[in-house]
Amino acid sequence: SIGFDLYRKSGNEEEVKLNEEPITLSTNFQDITADRNKDNTYRLCFAGSDETLDTYTITAAQASAGLPYISIPLAGTTGVSSEYYYDANDASVGDLDGDGVYEIVLKRLLRSSSSTEDEEDESEAVQMGPWHTTLLEAYKLDGSFLWRVALGPNVPVGNLTSFAVYDFDGDGKCEIAVRTAEGTVFGDGTEIKDTDGDGKVDYRVEGSAHIHGGPEFLSVLDGMTGRELARTDYIALGKSEDWGDNYYKRSASYRVGVGCFSGTTPSILICRGVYGKMVLEAWDFQGQELKKRWRFDTSDGVHGDYAGQGNHSLSVGDVDDDGCDEVVYGGCCIDHNGKGLWNSRHGHGDALHLGKFDPSRKGLQIWSCFEACPFKVGAALRDARTGETIWDFPYSGDMGRCLVADIDPDSPGCEMWWYKGNAHSCTGADLGYGAGSSSMSYNMAVWFSNSLNRQLLDRSKIDASKEKRVFTIYRYEVTTINSSKSNPCFYADIWGDWREEIIQVTSDQTELRLFTTWYPTDSVSYTHL
């Protein structure tokens, strides 16, 4: 087994070894002897070796205050607009410079009088004043600002900007895949000009909440600089009516993801459409250009019955155990070759989860809820290989939320529940807790404490499943994003010891705060990210 030695240097004192025996039973260490009034630098080595694997310094200011977070100051935006403010929204992480440490990629949205959120039901009219309406920014965990991309007037406030951070070309550094348009200004100052020669680069329409046309692109950005590495045309708009309305809202249902559709290399997945026509495309990036792998189109004369089966999110995974990823998109699944794999015809919904939820069943399962299922089903557990329903909850309305997580040590596998519903076992048995005014959160699940069961993250607090408080995050002057969704900017296993860190923005929108656990544990696992 792998063992570690840990050393500490306090201020100008000599370095000391903290462990008497090699650390083999955990991937964390709680130092109870450190002088909090001094900077403490920790050095990690393999047991019996003096070769440094990593170092990290906890400053006296951090330690003396006893704060369970690190701060990343947000860059000012007066260079973008002296009149408008930009608020932090969704974030992701990736190793942008190849140094083995994650950086943060953050989306910032234009603040307005009626909404600062990335809401699915965004009804606010397009902002006509400022030129740049959505920002992407990159930060190092030490607070250093790396770059900014201003996506321009044709990528407005709303749920219209999804992005993926991944090492698409295998060079050890992550790129960013994002939808761009005329007017986008990249991290090196390069701008997408008038590409179609129509004499304009601003396609906003006064009084409308959505863009009515203009060239759209898929761009791949260099993670270190934010400059554009490659560009191709995005899935074409065509007619608004094809996508389910005549006012350009449903045609702006964009999704992005990452899938290993070849079985060996990652591809960029882009999607357009949920309620009517749906198009998905897979693109490969190998350092200089984008090459289309496949296209799935419900108007191709073959997959017409898949129309309207999309979702407000998507999940990617190998559902049929063939070594290649598939795309689970609401009521349907697209095979790794871009062909329809199955269509359960449940329709679309707000939440969808793919994973190994029932250990007694072969393969993966899907837990999701639906807005207006034709079978009058509010939430269902389906077999990911076939789309077959395993069990479901009858409901004729819009079931807006559901969640699945292993929260109960007394119940095998994962537990599942929905808005105001009791927790159920993976086989559908009612476990008798959760419903009512004190119902469990159905928002997000997180590993934060020393338990192998997950805890529930909602509204800047973490609770165990049966109303036991684990951490009150809102005490540290942070806020959530996306209005009623009450999301953090991001959460994942950033440090690598399998517990998850949580990134939230301060209430005054001046910095990100990355919260990490202080619970020691002797449970070990590979990193979850």
Report residues per predicted region.
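Recognizes extended acidic, P/S/T-rich segments that occur
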Residues: 2-37
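Conserved small/polar residues in nucleotide/adenosyl-binding loops
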Residues: 527-528
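Beta-propeller blade termini
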Residues: 89-96, 161-169, 255-261, 312-319, ...
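Beta-propeller domains
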Residues: 236-241, 245-424
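Extracellular fibronectin type III
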Residues: 49-65
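Beta-strand-rich modules
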Residues: 35-48
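Acidic/hydrophobic-patterned starts of short beta strands in beta-sheet-rich repeat architectures
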Residues: 98-108, 170-179, 263-271, 321-329, ...
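Short, conserved, GDST-rich strand-edge loop motifs in beta-rich repeat architectures
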Residues: 107-131, 179-212, 371
